[in-house]
């Protein structure tokens, strides 16, 4: 288990900071944040100037259990830099942007709101990691804003160092802590010392018992000094590092790579410059021609012919001279079905008249 204390005042003398780091190591803390506090608008004079403190005493070794006893672990305490801005107006809060070089020079960014409008804006901000609730924050904390803060991944810090001050600060601490626990159900709560005196520092197990006094369970109070601060540090790293990361199933990745290879084979040219036979004109070799589309038109014509027949006229003769019978007219050849159906009745009548005339001529000759 890794324990954190994310609030140690950087304005203290260096020997005192070094003694406090040694005490943190004895209590089992693994990481701390040295905080630079700015009241009002931040400027170029507030660029990070915090240097890493070297602990020379080798006898001060950290404990893995969090109790105040000497251990055999040789791990050194990790130090982060933190900027804490006390904002009373929205103009001061709007100075905290990702493009500000002062903000970029620190590892962790936190805000101490003294106005409800600043607190509401901080709960919906992407530029900060921690909201510190101080006893000077004289406003009502709404549960909706706290849940919005949790959804954004922002953590709310409570400074337990106010318990060792005057009675008014102690009462204000329990009121604020109880309302935050009721609103957040114990989520995204961080417990930190004020970092101004070694007498106010407590071990992680003492803070776990302290959490019971304002509504936290043992696991939630333990997470307030281990899991939640660790997540806040990761949130700060992701805020500073802008990029895109994808997580895929290995089996799905194999299928995707195979699909890319197949797609590459389909789209890669084959360096074949010889055209296909259907695109080559046989008469003119070497020239590629596009076959022209052929259209066929069918026309149907119907012709109608009228059969002209000469009716025989009798010639008056005094002598009996044989008359040459007229040949019957040839039947017209109908080229269409309509002609054959319309002329069948007329030809039959004309043929009957011609037969009667021939019989009359034979009788006259006799």
Curated annotation (Swiss-Prot):
Residue spans of biased composition, Low complexity class: 291-324, 333-351
Region spans: Disordered: 265-366
Superkingdom of source: Eukaryota
This protein's UniProt keywords: Hydrolase, Nucleus, tRNA processing
Compartments where located: Nucleus
Example of a GO cellular component annotation carried by this entry: nucleolar ribonuclease P complex
Catalytic activity: Endonucleolytic cleavage of RNA, removing 5'-extranucleotides from tRNA precursor
Pfam families tied to this protein: RNase_P_p30
InterPro entries in alphabetical order: Pol/histidinol_Pase-like (IPR016195), RNase_P_p30 (IPR002738)
Example of a GO MF term: ribonuclease P activity
Top EC category: hydrolase
EC number: 3.1.26.5
Compositional bias ranges of the Basic and acidic residues kind: 275-290, 352-366
Gene Ontology BP terms: rRNA processing; tRNA processing
Family to which the UniProt record says this protein belongs: Belongs to the eukaryotic/archaeal RNase P protein component 3 family.
Reported function: Component of ribonuclease P, a protein complex that generates mature tRNA molecules by cleaving their 5'-ends.
Identification of the protein by name: Ribonuclease P protein subunit drpp30
Gene: drpp30
């Amino acid at each position: 288990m890794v324990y954190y204390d994310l609030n140690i005042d950087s304005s203290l003398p260096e020997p005192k900071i070094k003694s406090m780091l040694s005490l943190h190591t004895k209590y089992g803390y693994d990481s701390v944040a040295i905080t630079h506090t700015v009241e009002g608008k931040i400027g170029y004079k507030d660029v990070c100037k915090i240097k890493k403190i070297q602990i020379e005493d080798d006898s001060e070794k950290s404990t893995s259990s969090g109790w105040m006893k000497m251990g055999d672990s040789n791990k050194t305490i990790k130090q982060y830099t933190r900027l804490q801005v006390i904002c009373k107006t929205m103009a001061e809060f709007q100075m905290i942007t990702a493009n500000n070089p002062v903000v970029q020079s620190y590892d962790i960014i936190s805000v101490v709101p003294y106005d409800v409008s600043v607190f509401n804006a901080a709960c919906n901000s992407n530029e900060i990691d921690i909201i510190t609730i101080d006893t000077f924050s004289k406003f009502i904390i709404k549960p909706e804003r706290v849940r919005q803060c949790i959804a954004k991944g922002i953590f709310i810090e409570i400074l337990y160092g106010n318990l060792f001050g005057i009675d008014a600060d102690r009462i204000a601490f329990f009121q604020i802590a109880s309302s935050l626990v009721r609103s957040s159900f114990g989520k995204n709560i961080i417990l930190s010392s004020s970092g101004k005196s070694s007498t106010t520092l407590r071990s992680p197990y003492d803070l776990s018992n302290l959490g019971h006094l304002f509504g936290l369970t043992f696991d939630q109070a333990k997470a307030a000094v281990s899991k939640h601060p660790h997540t806040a540090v990761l949130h700060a790293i992701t805020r500073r590092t802008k990029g895109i990361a994808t997580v895929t199933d290995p089996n799905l990745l194999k299928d995707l790579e195979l699909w890319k290879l197949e797609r590459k084979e389909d789209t890669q040219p084959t360096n074949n410059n010889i055209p296909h036979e259907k695109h080559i004109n046989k008469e003119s070799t070497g020239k590629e021609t596009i076959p022209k589309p052929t259209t066929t038109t069918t026309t149907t014509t119907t012709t109608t012919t009228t059969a002209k027949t000469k009716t025989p006229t009798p010639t008056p003769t005094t002598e009996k001279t044989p008359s040459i019978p007229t040949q019957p007219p040839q039947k017209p050849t109908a080229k269409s079905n309509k002609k054959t159906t319309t002329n069948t009745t007329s030809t039959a009548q004309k043929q009957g008249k011609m037969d009667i005339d021939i019989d009359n001529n034979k009788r006259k000759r006799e």
